[in-house]
Amino acid sequence: MIDKNVIQICKERLVAQRSDLMNRLHTHRLEFFERETGGDEADQTVSLLNENRMFIAQQRMRHQLMEVELALSRIEKGTFGICEETQEPIESQRLLAIPWTRLSIEGAEIRESQDQKRA
């Protein structure tokens, strides 16, 4: 069983992380629409490279936001802190470090070895 204080701390961190990610995504969106277009070929190339970097950063932030939302959902359902691989409680230190994690250290090792076998 996960300590209720750990769950509360994780929930607070997740809510703060969600807010930060949403603000950053909004800022990226504004920057995208405010960018300058036109210019010579070199300017257009730099612009395309910057757009690509922004797109990749937004994808990462959206993925992280999804993980945060899923973790908050698990808190509401009462399944937060249970490893998806082993069905055992995730270590409190790990949850405090990575509150959106779905795997214990053991579960992460199992999943990693399975992924390596598939590759």
Model features per residue range: what roles?
Residues 89-91, 112:
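Short functional micro-motifs and their immediate structural scaffolds
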Residues 83-86, 104:
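Short cysteine-rich clusters marking metal-coordination/redox-active sites
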Residues 31, 85, 89:
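Short acidic/histidine-centered micro-motifs embedded in hydrophobic/aromatic stretches
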Residues 99-108:
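Cysteine-rich micro-motifs
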Residues 1-77, 112-119:
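Interaction interfaces in information-processing and related assembly proteins
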Residues 76-80, 100:
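Short metal-coordination and nucleic-acid-contact micro-motifs, chiefly zinc-binding Cys/His arrays
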Residues 93-98:
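Short Cys/His-rich "knuckle" micro-motifs
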Residues 9, 85, 99:
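Amphipathic alpha-helical recognition patches that constitute DNA-binding helices
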